[in-house]
Amino acid sequence: MLRLWPGGAPGGLASILLRISLRLALWLPPLTLGSALAEGPGELYVPQHMPHHLVPAARSHAPLRAGHAGTTYIFGRDGGLIVYTWPPNDRPSTRADRLAVGFSTQQKDAVLVRVDSSSGLGDYLQLQIERGNIKVVFNVGTDDINIEETSKFVNDGKYHIVRFTRSGGNATLQVDDLPVIERYPSGNIDNERLAIARQRIPYRLGRVVDDWLLDKGRQLTIFNSQTTIKIGGWEKGSRPFQGQLSGLYYNGLKVLNMAAEGDPNVRVEGSARLVGDMPSSSITPQSSVSAAGNRSETSPSITDITTTTASNRQGKQTTTPQDDLLVASAECPSDDEDIDPCDPSSGGLAHPPLPEAKGYPSPEVIRESSSTTGMVVGIVAAAALCILILLYAMYKYRNRDEGSYHVDESRNYISNSATQPNGAAVKEKPIGVPKNKKDKKNKDKEYYV
């Protein structure tokens, strides 16, 4: 630290004033300039009062990925079919599956999506409408496993979203914003039979049997050699779907997008028709409120379809209601920890577009460059003046310790001593020693008169 006094910094008030002045000199000007420049040169943000109101919104617990409902196909009365076929050398076998789709229809019974394995294996997964309720049936080598949502009818012509996940023999199903239904096979009967059978198995064969059962159990939880994904269910003896399907997602595949882009592994048959010219087409449903659950739902008709329009940076953006965005959550429909995480290649996270606020003015930005500059200059000048005052006070305090003392020589009370200008006494040689010797000699003399 820089020493201002040769004998060290004074204590007490001077030390405190020194610290305050140094801190003001170092920090006050930069902080003043930084706060003035933080809002931009010559701009003051003046927010206006925005009236608040309640807006009902239905949000999904699953993360949103895309900014629109996805590619939409309409299936007419004559029936249509979209088939995706895996290449022969690229047929997956999965332990966990994810399926999600948005749709609207008035049919009580129809097949929406079906995934089949190679011929001879018998594994399959089917999403269907049965008696107006959503139902999923799958078989991965044991028996048919069913999971169904019976608390809500989906054949009302409104827009609905279905999310299904499978992990081994366990499954979950969710329709719109209803609670998730879980299905966990108990398997107690098989465990009891296995315990009885182990008692009759010879000890030397126990290890071989355990290995076989373990391998068999693994096979009974895997959807082996998947070959096709069929959308629409238009086949001989099947229940064709009539209505619209949007944003279908299955294990990282967006089959409707691939069909719209002309993928060679996808073929379109029958009366299936793409809505719009681009895969980014979306559905604009009409919002309605259900009386039972008091939830925000959507009721689109098949003809109420529009395409997403691009907007520039300063213009208005055409957005869709928030219920459309729930279809995009098909890419990650569940947060179950037992299921593998979402494929990062399926898309990045994105914020859902918010509906445009109408009738409320936007905050104004008022430019006042001259007043802002004057304020900054005034603050800096005041800080400099404070520093100068503190330095002057410290200077006066320092000079008080080095004052001089004046001596009036006319009133010299000590005749044999002298003083310096600063008051210190000066030592002189004693003159009384030779005088004493002279007096001693005078004592020996006698005078006679």
UniProtKB/Swiss-Prot annotation:
It is found in: Membrane. Residues 1-38 form the signal peptide. The keyword RNA-binding does not apply. Its main location: membrane. It is a single-pass type I membrane protein. Residues 395-449 are cytoplasmic. Residues 71-272 form the Laminin G-like domain. Residues 276-366, 415-449 are annotated as: Disordered. The keyword Transmembrane helix applies. The chain crosses the membrane at residues 374-394. Residues 312-322 have a biased composition (Polar residues). Keywords: Cell adhesion, Membrane, Signal, Transmembrane, Transmembrane helix. Disulfide bonds: none annotated. Belongs to the neurexin family. PANTHER family: NEUREXIN-1, PIKACHURIN-LIKE PROTEIN. This is Neurexin-1a-beta.
